[in-house]
Amino acid sequence: MRKLLLLALFTAVPAAAQTPAVEAARAAGIIGERYDGYLGVASAVSGAVRSQVATINIQRRSLYSNLAARKGVSPQDVGITAGCQLLARVAVGQAYMWADGAWRRRAAGQAAPVPDYCR
């Protein structure tokens, strides 16, 4: 079921348009991926970037809800499944939120942060 959700999730919609400000904040570790499939704010950020993060999360929530309705699962399940894939893509220096709610940064030489439940 997880593989079907992932396939549907990542083929159903093109990658969300990321603005240069969002990409710069992500690269700086100011914003990052959360375990639940949403983008989060790890430290102080401008109102414009915070607004763009909220817009991205609204788009993700809509996608997760639509996919969940089609697959007969909860939007939270779809988000967690997406979170597994998004965390696997976190680059060195980028921030990410683990399931315990703590923000971390991926260090050089560190494996991609993938929770055990994703495997």
Give the location of each predicted region.
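Short, surface-exposed polybasic-aromatic patches that bind anionic ligands, especially phosphate groups
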Residues: A27-A28, D36, S65, A69
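N-terminal signal peptide c-region/cleavage motif recognized by signal peptidases
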Residues: A12-P14
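Amphipathic, charged alpha-helical segments and their helix-to-coil junctions
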Residues: Q18-E33, G40-A44, A48-S51, G79-R119
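Surface-exposed patches in mature extracellular/periplasmic domains of secreted proteins
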Residues: Q52, Y64-A82
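A periodicity- and composition-biased signal for non-globular, repetitive helical segments
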Residues: A8-L9, N66
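Sec-dependent signal peptide recognition
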Residues: M1-L7
